[in-house]
From Swiss-Prot:
Subunit structure: Homodimer. Interacts with VP1. Interacts with VP2. Interacts with NSP2 and NSP6.
Protein name: Non-structural protein 5
Composition skew (Basic and acidic residues), residue ranges: 23-38, 98-113
Family: Belongs to the rotavirus NSP5 family.
Main location as per UniProt: host cell
Any one Gene Ontology molecular-function term assigned to this protein's record: magnesium ion binding
Organism: Rotavirus B (isolate RVB/Rat/United States/IDIR/1984/G1P[X]) (RV-B)
Domain of life: Viruses
One cellular component term from this protein's GO annotations in UniProt: host cell cytoplasm
Keyword Glycoprotein: yes
InterPro entries per the UniProt record, alphabetical: Rotavirus_A/C_NSP5, Rotavirus_B_NSP5
Function of the molecule: Plays an essential role in the viral genome replication. Participates, together with NSP2, in the formation of viral factories (viroplasms) which are large inclusions in the host cytoplasm where replication intermediates are assembled and viral RNA replication takes place. Orchestrates the recruitment of viroplasmic proteins such as capsid proteins to these factories.
Region (Disordered): 18-40, 86-114
Length: 174
């Protein structure tokens, strides 16, 4: 109902005056139904002056009027967003509205920011791919290649690591 201020409620006032003059009539009908236990049932039906058909047509007419109204580009929400509430005066003041040019500039800056982040993400993915390639190149392909690489790098191992390496080689031969 944020956009309720756009509607004309004069029709509703007229219908209130008409309905105030008319009274709702109530008819009580007693129906007797015979059940297996042969009990009596009393039904109360309330019937209004208006028929069901006419109330439907009123709604359909109102709906058609709403459909014929021109489409408003700017809703009430967008209109009232340009006002700021002043606490000291308890009123609404018009806010500084950005011009179309500044809005376009801010949108273009936003898209440039997205493009920059896209390029950064692309570079990061390329570098990650290169790191994976280097890791694969350093990984031994076969057991013999791993053995030869280990022997080449024996000088970098500590004494305990060398002892563990010799023990593992001896155990693998058994």
């Amino acid at each position: 109902m944020a956009e309720a201020s756009e509607f004309n409620f004069n029709l509703r006032r007229k219908s209130r005056a008409v309905t105030a003059s008319r009274r709702v009539k109530e008819e009580v009908k007693e129906k007797q139904k015979m059940d297996d236990s042969k009990s009596q049932v009393v039904d109360v039906d309330s019937v209004s002056v208006y028929s069901h058909e006419s109330s439907r047509s009123n709604y359909s007419d109102a709906y058609e009027k709403l459909k014929r109204e021109p489409v408003v580009e700017e809703s009430n929400d967008a209109r009232y967003r340009t006002f700021e509430f002043s606490e000291d005066e308890e009123t609404f003041k018009p806010a500084n509205k950005m011009s179309d040019k500044s809005q376009r500039n801010s949108k273009s800056k936003h898209t440039e920011g997205l493009e920059c982040s896209d390029t950064v993400l692309e570079k990061i993915s390329e570098l990650t791919l290169e790191i994976e390639k280097v890791k694969q190149m350093n990984q031994p392909i076969t057991v013999d290649a791993a053995f030869n690489m280990t022997l080449r790098n024996v000088d970098n191992l500590t004494t305990r690591q060398k002892q563990a390496l010799v023990n593992s080689i001896i155990n693998s031969m058994n």
